[in-house]
Amino acid sequence: MDSQRNLLVIALLFVSFMIWQAWEQDKNPQPQQQQTTQTTTTAAGSAADQGVPASGQGKQITVKTDVLELTINTRGGDIEQALLLTYPKELKSNEPFQLLETTPEFLYQAQSGLTGRDGPDNPANGARPLYNVDKDTFVMADGQNELAIPMTYTDAAGNTFTKTFTLKRGEYAVSVGYNVQNTSAKPLEVSTFGQLKQSINLPSHRDTGSSNFALHTFRGAAYSTPDTKYEKYKFDTIADNENLNVSAKGGWVAMLQQYFATAWVPNNDGVNNFYTANLGNGIAAIGYKSQPVLVQPGQTGTLGSTLWVGPEIQNKMAAVAPHLDLTVDYGWLWFISQPLFKLLKWIHSFLGNWGFSIIVITFIVRGIMYPLTKAQYTSMAKMRMLQPKIAAMRERLGDDKQRQSQEMMALYKAEKVNPLGGCFPLLIQMPIFLALYYMLMGSVELRHAPFALWIHDLSAQDPYYILPILMGITMFFIQKMSPTTVTDPMQQKIMTFMPVIFTVFFLWFPSGLVLYYIVSNLVTILQQQLIYRGLEKRGLHSREKKKS
């Protein structure tokens, strides 16, 4: 196998990857218009079937820090809107990115409360407590590092339930704590629950294009337990009523999209029930319910959970809960993508530019893979040296395919040539290619990250298509500089158009990924020349002009 055939192998692998990606892509089902009933698992029913009351039953309060602006409804204390103040909705926009939303077009909320036998959140009738709060707006002042929002509710028996949201400067983890003051004569049995619910179908203003041909990032639910570190749960699976019902200690539940996530993390060491539910009307939910806690008469019980609502910043998410950083969609090669990102981030700490960091990591990766590249070219050179003998053998044996195969294998063995030697190193490199693909596409740090000149966003396609064209040119040079023994006219035509085909593919790829391939191709050209010089000294390569 020579370099020209390798290009064909790369193309086939690339197309296969894109077909597989399209097959695996989360295709959101269209909800039936007549569907209005809620469907839950038995274990999930305690929290999942609690609907949102009419807006007039509660009031909205605003909570603002340096990075978050939350809108909380005093009916139940649900977070109905979340703005990420340091992340613009679009490049060069003053409008912040909205993660949670409650509008007629789209619903995405973070719900929480106290359920159980004596909890104020009653699953039987969907009742939610109406909390009292002393003001409508809470703003973190300059120099203030923590902001607490206490909300109180007193039931008919005189028991007081205090729900407190605590936010810290620069943080996307929101602490939700509960104090249960039992003034009755009997023990109170309560459990915490946290639920995320979202419209399955995206309206146009929420569609980020994360499901186009060039890019597939997961949008849906996920959960983690000690036995299952990280498991995705598709919205269409929930829509089909194939619901999750798992009980385990610790863990978390989340809803994911490109670059951003929400997650409920129970603050207890007891057993939690994790569930998903189809709430009807095209709304999916994932949540947890903790095991009951008894608060004795005259005592105050303390419970709580943590909500992550923000960008997928891996080190901060890992500090909130084990394996929460796995929500960054690095695909099935996350174990390669994660260390690559850590290396990229370390390089960025010195250079301060993600584009130049991509260039440096490309040199590092290609340097590490150089022995494989050298082995690949050496094997291809040996195969080319055998072509005259193989041609003579085929002419001598005619149509006897069995003898051709036997004598060819004997020839390979005698000459110590592995016929797959040119392909095997290429196959080893494919996981690195895919891992880099996912790393560059799933890291929020590269969202709206500028490079230089006309590239203002490495996560978006080149607006002028200059980088894809440059990539095609470098691929053309690699093709022209590579010796070939291909004689089949069809293969020759395919290889001639290969740079054009790849250029078209890459027109819609994010510029950060295209930049990686340009630099990788340039490094390939340099390595190719270096390897050819060594092969010339061994008599395995000549500088004769390549046949067209």
UniProtKB/Swiss-Prot annotation:
Mind telling me which InterPro entries this protein's record contains? Membr_insert_YidC (IPR019998), Membr_insert_YidC_N (IPR028053), YidC/ALB3/OXA1/COX18 (IPR001708), YidC/Oxa/ALB_C (IPR028055), YidC_ALB_C (IPR047196), YidC_periplasmic_sf (IPR038221)
CDD domains tied to this protein? 5TM_YidC_Alb3, EcYidC-like_peri
Q: Where is the composition biased (Low complexity)?
A: 29-42
Q: Does the keyword Aminoacyl-tRNA synthetase apply?
A: no
Source organism superkingdom: Bacteria
* GO BP term, example: protein insertion into membrane
Segments of this protein annotated with the region Disordered? 28-58
Give any GO molecular function from the UniProt entry. Answer: membrane insertase activity
Endoplasmic reticulum listed as a keyword:
no
Q: Which Pfam families match?
A: 60KD_IMP (PF02096), YidC_periplas (PF14849)
The main location class comes to membrane
The protein's location, in the record's own words, is: Cell inner membrane
Give the keywords, sorted: Cell inner membrane, Cell membrane, Chaperone, Membrane, Protein transport, Transmembrane, Transmembrane helix, Transport
In what way does this protein cross or attach to the membrane? Multi-pass membrane protein
The portions of this protein that span the membrane are 6-26, 350-370, 420-440, 458-478, 499-519
Gene Ontology cellular-component annotations: plasma membrane
Similarity-based family: Belongs to the OXA1/ALB3/YidC family. Type 1 subfamily.
Subunit relationships: Interacts with the Sec translocase complex via SecD. Specifically interacts with transmembrane segments of nascent integral membrane proteins during membrane integration.
> PANTHER family attached here?
CYTOCHROME C OXIDASE ASSEMBLY PROTEIN COX18, MITOCHONDRIAL, OXA1
NCBIfam families reported for this sequence: PRK01318.1-1, PRK01318.1-3, PRK01318.1-4, yidC_nterm, yidC_oxa1_cterm
This molecule's function is given as: Required for the insertion and/or proper folding and/or complex formation of integral membrane proteins into the membrane. Involved in integration of membrane proteins that insert both dependently and independently of the Sec translocase complex, as well as at least some lipoproteins. Aids folding of multispanning membrane proteins.
> What is the name listed in the Swiss-Prot or TrEMBL entry for this protein?
Membrane protein insertase YidC
What organism does this protein naturally occur in?
Answer: Enterobacter sp. (strain 638)
